[in-house]
């Protein structure tokens, strides 16, 4: 359980509570609030999507022995309507009050059992504006999710990879695709993340914000190092904006996952913010292919003096919920090796996701087998 704010210490790879105790973060992702175009699942959009969360998770996460959760949300759900420019030159934002009330409920429910929450600003295929995209893990999605549709008025369906690459490159370069009809994209997203951080500035259940899920681009945006520098600049700007309204939060900055770019890691320095946590995701075929990446991320974390967190993994496809699952035949041994390495080296972790543990969604391996393995790896 987690009670109260957490923090980092410059030069240390640990996370601490207010009493100075080291707190290993071991948890799971509870997703579902990232889907849709501002609408709840009870009123699905044309792709059948909408936001919602499995309510059984409120009790199960604590009962299973985890101490925190990562909850993917989306800027598109927070702000489905574009901001309005006032006569005085300032922007008025139109936040989704129904969605915010749902986040309040979720925060309250997990807070009752002392489960810390890191809200993740998720994206897959950039935005719901990008439809029928060739998404790499799940074999294609009717629509993406993440950034709001109004950022991308000129996207047509079916979406192509070059369109998504250009959109992400423009985003991290703070180049607008809507002209003066909205703030520059990073500034617009800053407003959303600041709003959420301020909303929970006195609520210690919300322990952090994951500032951008799985950033990526390709050579059209520059060399891997140049793209990594763009990411560092973005995280610095976003983290400083969040800290202006809430200095308690852990600020998570992610590398691109292996496979989304030709190389990973690409970052050569951390963002210039306090309470930063370095994060990576692992969706490789097995432990042998994962280990070089994990070691590289760990090396960076130690060099920079920041904690490191494996923010997503699915036990080498044991928990895959998509159409093209490729289960590692040695998934148990490989997952144990992965988590043993993490625990031995102080790498925090969060399994993805609750849907393959506490719902009826089909997975290649029975849910109880996955859960038992994860529980066996929770540090005492």
Short names for language-model regions:
Residues 115, 204, 249-250, 274-276, ...:
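A structural micro-motif
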Residues 118, 252, 277-279, 309, ...:
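Structural detector of well-ordered beta-strand residues that form the stable sheet scaffold
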Residues 25-50, 277-279, 301, 357-373:
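Glycan-binding loop/region signatures in secreted carbohydrate-active enzymes
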Residues 58, 107, 239, 266-268, ...:
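Short amphipathic alpha-helical segments and helix-helix/interface helices
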Residues 26, 287, 291-380:
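Substrate-binding cleft of secreted/luminal carbohydrate-active enzymes
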Residues 207, 265-289, 307:
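Aromatic- and acid-rich polysaccharide-binding/catalytic face
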Residues 257-260, 283-286, 315:
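Short, catalytically relevant binding-site loops at active-site mouths
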Residues 5-250, 255-265:
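Active-site mouth of glycoside hydrolases
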